[in-house]
C-alpha cells in the first residue's frame, strides 16, 4: 500500500523539480503586492527621517525657527507713523499730479525777462504758488486736493487692511495718473477726464503705449523705476511691521471673543464709511448746491467748465476729474416707458408726414451754415447805452427782409457751449436739472451716440456731409472729442492738423477776424460738389474788450452816462460789432455769387459781460438775455427772400433754430423736427436764465410768448403743457433714458 501511495503522490521536492522542468509560469500573489505597497510609506518615512537628520536640514530648521521667533518679536509700527507717512505720501501725490499740468515757459527773448519773473513762471514757481496761495490769498485748493486724495488713500487702507500694501498701491495709481495726465496735456492740451476711461473698458488698453511720445519716455521709465523700488520698500516694511492688519480682523472665527467682534465691526464700519464718503463726494461734486459742491467752494474751488485744462490747472486735476465723473442730467418723467415713447413716436410720425406732404424741398438740397457769432448783440438795445452811430446797420437792414428776430440766451458773458449745444441738438438746457451747467463737459462725454442735426447731411452724403470751423483751440469745451461724436468729418482750429487755413487778425486784436473765418467757410463750399452742414464758431468779439482797433469812432459816438471804465469796454466792443456787421454783409454778398443753394443760420450766443450797470437792474433781466439772429438764403436757393411771420420767428431760443430753418426753407422734417416745430409754436422761447453776470445759466426758467412776454409755466395752455411734457420725454430718452427713439425712425427725414 505504501508503495502504491508513494507512486501516486510524489514528494514536494520531486514535484517542484518536475514543475521547474515543465517551466510553468508563476502566478503573482495579491498578498505579495499588498505587502510591498505597505512598505512604501515606511520607506518614505525612513528616508525623510534620514534627510531631516542631515546637517543642512538641521541648520535650515534652526534658521526658520530663528526667523519665526524674530518675526514674532517684530515691533508694531505706531498709528502715528501711519498718519505721518500718509500725509507725506498724499502731499507728494498732490504735487506730482499738479506738476503734470505745468510746463517750463519759453521766451522769445530770454534776456529781456528778469530772473524773478522766470522763477515765478517756472514749474517750481507755479507749484510753489499753488501751495503758498493758502497763506497769500486764503485759497485752499491745494488742501482740497490733499483731502480728496486722502479719501482715496483711506479707502485703500481700510479695504486692504494692510497699510504698506495700500501705500504702494496708492503711489502706483497716483503716479500713473500724473504721468498719463502730463502726456495728454502735452499732446492735446487737455487733462485726463472720466470719459477717457472708456478707452480702457473698450478693450483698447493695449494701445496706450503707442501714444507715448519719445520725449516722454524718460519720464515713463523713471516713474516705473521709482515705483518698483517703492513697492519693494513697502513690501519689506509690511513684512517687518508687526502690525499685520491696520484694524484687527478675523475671517475664520469672527465671533471668537469680544475683542474679535469689536475688531471685525470696526473694520467693516471703517470700510463702509470711507467708501461712502468718497462716493458721496464724487457723486455730488458736480451738482450745484450739494454738500460737496459747497464744501469744495468753501476751500477755494472755482469751477471753470469752459476749459478742462484751465479748471484742472486752477482747481487741481483730481478735483477737476471728479467734478466731471457725475452730473445729474434730469429726473425721469413719471410716464416714461417703452409704450409711451412708441405712442409718442407714432403720433409725431403721422404729423410729420402731413407736414411733409405740403413741403417741396429737402434740407439736404441746400448747404446749411450755422454761425455762432461770439458775443454778437446790439449794444443800442441795452438800457443806459447811448450811441450816436448804429454799430450794425447792415444786419438791421437785413432783418427787415429775411427771417429774423431775437434769441433768448441762457447766459451773459459766458456759456457759449450751452447755446451751441442747444442749436446742434435741439435739446434745451432748461429741461435739464439745474445742476447741469455744461452739457459739453458733463453730458456728451458720457453719451455713446448723441444725435445732432448735421447727421441729416451725413446720412445723405456720408462722413463728408458735415464739417466744423473754430478759429481758436480745439479742446475748448471739449469740442474736438464732442464733434467727433457728433459726426463732423473734421474740426478745423488753430491747433488742428491741418490747422484752419485763414487766420488773419484785425489791428492788434488777439483773435482771428470774422472775415477770415468766413473765408474758410467759402472755401469749403466752393471745394465740395455736394451740399453739406457747416458749423462755424467765431472768436472776433470775444472778451476782453481792450483798445484793439484803430480809428474807433465809437469813442466819440458814445454819449452814455456811465463810468469811463465801463464806457471804454462798451466802445471797444461796439467797434468789433461794427466790423462783424460789415464782414457779415460781405460774406452774404459772396454767397449770393455762389451758384449753389446756401442757407445761413446766424446768431449771437450771449451779450458780453461789460454791462455792469444794466445787469444790476433786475428789470433788465430779459433784455440782457436777448441777442439778434437771422436765417437767410442766397439767390440760388428756392427760399431766397423768405421771411417768416414775426409771430412765428420774432422770439426764439437756439434749440428751435433747425426747426425754423426747415420752415424757412419749406423743407421736409423728421418726427423730431416736427415736435420742435409744434413746441415752438406754443412756447416760442424757453431758457434757463442766469442768476448773476458772467454766469452759465443756473437760475430760473423763462418761457416767452410770441410777443416776447414772460409767461409762468402754470399759465401755459393745456396744449403747451402737453407739448412740453412730450419734449421732456424725448429729451430724457435722448440724454439719459433707454434710447427707445433711436430705433424708431424718429430722427429720420422721409
Set out the residue ranges of the language-model regions.
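A diffuse structural propensity rather than consistent per-protein peaks
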Residues: 181-196, 334-337, 493, 513, ...
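Transmembrane and membrane-interface helices of multi-pass
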Residues: 38-308
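Alpha-helix initiation and N-capping motif
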Residues: 197-200, 314-318, 338-341, 392, ...
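Short hydrophobic "helix-edge" motifs at membrane interfaces and signal-peptide entry regions
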Residues: 135, 363-365, 594-596
Amino acid at each position: 500500500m505504501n508503495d502504491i501511495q508513494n507512486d501516486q503522490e510524489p514528494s514536494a521536492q520531486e514535484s517542484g523539480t518536475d514543475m521547474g522542468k515543465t517551466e510553468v509560469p508563476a502566478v503573482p500573489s495579491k498578498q505579495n503586492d499588498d505587502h510591498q505597497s505597505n512598505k512604501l510609506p515606511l520607506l518614505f518615512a525612513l528616508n525623510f527621517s534620514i534627510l531631516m537628520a542631515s546637517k543642512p536640514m538641521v541648520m535650515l530648521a534652526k534658521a526658520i525657527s530663528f526667523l519665526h521667533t524674530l518675526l514674532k518679536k517684530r515691533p508694531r509700527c505706531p498709528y502715528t507713523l501711519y498718519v505721518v507717512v500718509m500725509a507725506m505720501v498724499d502731499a507728494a501725490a498732490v504735487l506730482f499730479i499738479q506738476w503734470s499740468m505745468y510746463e517750463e515757459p519759453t521766451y522769445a527773448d530770454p534776456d529781456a525777462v528778469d530772473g524773478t519773473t522766470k522763477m515765478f513762471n517756472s514749474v517750481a514757481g507755479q507749484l510753489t504758488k499753488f501751495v503758498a496761495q493758502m497763506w497769500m490769498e486764503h485759497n485752499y485748493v491745494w488742501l482740497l486736493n490733499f483731502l480728496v486724495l486722502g479719501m482715496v488713500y483711506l479707502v485703500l487702507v481700510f479695504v486692504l487692511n494692510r497699510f504698506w500694501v495700500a501705500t504702494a498701491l496708492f503711489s502706483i495709481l497716483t503716479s500713473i495718473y500724473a504721468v498719463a495726465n502730463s502726456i495728454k496735456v502735452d499732446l492735446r492740451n487737455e487733462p485726463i477726464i472720466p470719459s477717457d476711461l472708456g478707452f480702457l473698458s473698450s478693450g483698447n488698453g493695449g494701445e496706450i503705449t503707442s501714444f507715448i511720445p519719445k520725449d516722454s519716455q524718460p519720464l515713463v521709465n523713471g516713474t516705473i523705476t521709482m515705483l518698483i523700488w517703492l513697492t519693494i520698500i513697502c513690501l519689506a516694511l509690511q513684512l517687518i511691521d508687526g502690525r499685520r492688519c491696520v484694524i484687527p480682523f478675523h475671517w475664520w472665527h469672527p465671533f471668537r471673543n469680544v475683542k474679535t467682534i469689536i475688531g471685525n465691526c470696526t473694520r467693516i464700519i471703517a470700510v463702509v464709511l470711507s467708501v461712502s464718503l468718497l462716493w458721496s463726494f464724487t457723486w455730488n461734486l458736480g451738482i450745484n448746491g450739494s454738500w460737496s459742491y459747497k464744501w469744495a467752494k468753501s476751500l477755494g474751488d472755482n469751477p471753470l467748465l469752459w476749459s478742462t485744462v484751465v479748471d484742472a490747472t486752477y482747481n487741481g486735476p483730481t478735483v477737476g476729474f471728479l467734478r466731471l465723473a457725475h452730473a445729474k442730467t434730469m429726473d425721469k418723467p413719471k410716464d416714461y416707458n417703452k409704450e409711451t415713447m412708441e405712442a409718442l413716436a407714432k403720433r409725431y410720425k403721422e404729423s410729420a408726414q402731413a407736414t411733409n406732404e405740403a413741403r417741396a424741398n429737402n434740407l439736404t438740397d441746400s448747404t446749411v451754415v450755422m454761425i455762432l457769432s461770439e458775443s454778437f448783440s446790439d449794444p443800442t438795445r441795452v438800457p443806459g447805452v447811448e450811441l450816436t452811430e448804429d454799430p450794425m446797420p447792415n444786419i438791421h437792414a437785413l432783418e427787415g427782409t429775411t427771417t429774423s428776430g431775437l434769441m433768448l440766451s441762457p447766459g451773459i458773458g459766458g456759456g457759449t457751449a450751452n447755446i451751441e449745444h442747444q442749436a446742434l441738438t435741439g435739446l434745451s438746457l432748461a429741461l435739464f436739472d439745474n445742476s447741469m451747467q455744461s452739457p459739453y463737459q458733463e453730458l456728451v462725454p458720457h453719451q455713446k451716440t448723441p444725435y445732432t442735426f448735421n447727421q441729416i447731411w451725413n446720412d445723405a452724403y456720408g462722413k463728408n456731409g458735415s464739417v466744423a470751423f473754430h478759429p481758436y483751440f480745439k479742446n475748448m469745451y471739449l469740442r474736438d472729442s464732442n464733434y467727433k461724436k457728433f459726426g463732423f468729418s473734421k474740426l478745423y482750429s488753430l491747433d488742428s492738423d491741418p490747422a484752419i487755413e485763414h487766420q488773419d487778425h484785425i489791428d492788434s486784436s488777439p483773435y482771428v477776424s470774422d472775415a477770415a473765418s468766413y473765408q474758410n467757410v467759402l472755401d469749403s463750399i466752393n471745394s465740395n460738389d455736394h451740399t453739406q452742414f457747416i458749423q462755424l464758431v467765431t472768436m472776433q468779439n470775444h472778451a476782453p474788450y481792450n483798445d484793439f482797433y484803430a480809428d474807433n469812432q465809437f469813442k466819440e459816438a458814445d454819449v452814455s452816462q456811465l463810468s469811463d471804465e465801463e464806457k471804454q469796454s462798451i466802445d471797444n466792443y461796439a467797434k468789433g460789432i461794427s466790423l462783424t456787421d460789415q464782414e457779415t454783409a460781405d460774406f452774404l454778398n459772396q454767397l449770393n455769387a455762389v451758384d449753389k443753394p446756401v442757407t445761413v443760420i446766424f446768431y449771437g450766443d450771449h451779450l458780453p459781460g461789460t454791462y455792469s450797470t444794466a445787469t444790476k437792474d433786475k428789470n433788465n433781466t430779459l433784455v440782457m438775455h436777448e441777442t439778434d439772429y437771422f436765417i437767410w438764403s442766397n439767390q440760388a436757393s428756392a427760399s431766397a427772400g423768405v421771411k417768416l411771420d414775426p409771430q412765428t420767428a420774432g422770439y426764439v431760443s437756439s434749440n428751435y433754430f433747425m426747426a425754423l430753418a426747415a420752415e424757412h426753407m419749406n423743407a421736409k422734417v423728421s418726427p423730431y423736427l416736427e415736435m420742435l416745430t409744434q413746441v415752438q409754436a406754443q412756447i416760442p422761447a424757453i431758457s434757463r436764465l442766469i442768476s448773476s453776470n458772467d454766469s452759465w445759466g443756473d437760475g430760473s426758467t423763462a418761457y416767452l410768448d410770441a410777443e416776447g412776454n414772460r409767461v409762468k409755466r402754470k399759465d401755459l395752455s393745456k396744449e403747451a403743457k402737453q407739448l412740453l411734457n412730450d419734449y421732456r420725454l424725448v429729451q430724457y430718452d435722448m440724454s439719459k433714458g433707454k434710447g427707445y427713439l433711436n430705433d424708431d425712425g424718429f430722427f429720420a427725414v422721409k
